Amino acid sequence: MNRLMILVFAAVILALASADDVDIAKRGVPCLCVSDGPRPRGNNLSGTIWMKTGGYGGNGCPKGWHFCGKSRGLLSDCCKQ
């Protein structure tokens, strides 16, 4: 069970977008922004999950991005460019 949790966590970390990537809008783990409204079928997720790191400040979003989620996560935030 512990190995499975480590593998899942590693997969999430590797799937997250990097702020230096050229195709940043096409990569990362999607999340629900407030502007997306309620989530009926067919509604798109327009945000991207960013892990909170020291370089991004308190909101967890990189430069040029803003927080768009309903609530802040412990280790990550939903951000939109």
UniProtKB/Swiss-Prot annotation:
GO terms for cellular component: extracellular region; nematocyst. Pfam families: Toxin_4 (PF00706). Keywords: Cleavage on pair of basic residues, Disulfide bond, Ion channel impairing toxin, Nematocyst, Neurotoxin, Secreted, Signal, Toxin, Voltage-gated sodium channel impairing toxin. Residues 1-19 form the signal peptide. Its main location: secreted. It is found in: Secreted; Nematocyst. Disulfide bonds join C31-C78, C33-C68, C61-C79. Belongs to the sea anemone sodium channel inhibitory toxin family. Type I subfamily. Binds specifically to voltage-gated sodium channels (Nav), thereby delaying their inactivation during signal transduction. Causes death to crabs. This is Delta-actitoxin-Aeq2d.
